[in-house]
A protein has these predicted regions:
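Conserved Rossmann-like nucleotide-binding pocket used by diverse enzymes
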Residues: 9, 27, 56
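A short acidic, Gly/Pro-enriched loop at the edge of an enzyme's catalytic core
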Residues: 14-26
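A short glycine-rich, Lys/Arg-flanked "PGG" loop and its adjoining helix->strand segment in the class I
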Residues: 39-54
Length: 141
């Protein structure tokens, strides 16, 4: 079911310029890895959510399966930077992608951080064998 958006707000996840208990849903795509302070971001998200509000954060993650993990690692360390260099002339930017995924906390740590910083429940939806994950947090208030 598609629900039309009433208002869309773009802003700093570490300092959301909205009153408390103001929004129904927060969505974020491929940004968690780039935030400097995950606990603060989750505190801000939970602060602005209305009761029963939900946050959905899609990001690239590391597979847990050892075979997928090694294949994913090799793909990110060799193929992605090479293709980035060939098509964009920028090896370094695409190397950053691999590094940011490697340094990103595990899904369990993300879920625990959500629950320690304002979310009453947090769960993950694993996609493509763990190459991407949607983190879903709910605030009851």
């Amino acid at each position: 079911k598609v629900i039309p958006a009433k208002n869309i707000h773009h802003g700093d996840a570490l300092k959301i310029d909205l009153p408390s208990s103001n929004v129904d849903v927060i969505s974020m795509g491929f940004a968690l890895r780039n935030l400097s302070d995950l606990p603060l971001a989750f505190q801000e998200m939970s602060r602005v959510l209305k009761p029963n509000g939900r946050t959905l954060c899609l990001d690239l993650t590391r597979p847990e399966n050892i075979i997928l993990k090694w294949g994913h690692y090799l793909f990110l360390r060799t193929y992605v930077p090479m293709v980035g260099f060939i098509f964009a002339g920028n090896f370094k930017a695409y190397s950053y992608l691999a590094n940011s995924i490697r340094e990103f906390p595990t899904a369990d740590i993300i879920l625990r951080t959500m629950e320690e910083n304002g979310f009453d429940s947090a769960r993950k939806v694993v996609l493509w064998g763990g190459i991407a994950t949607i983190f879903v947090g709910t605030v009851k208030k």
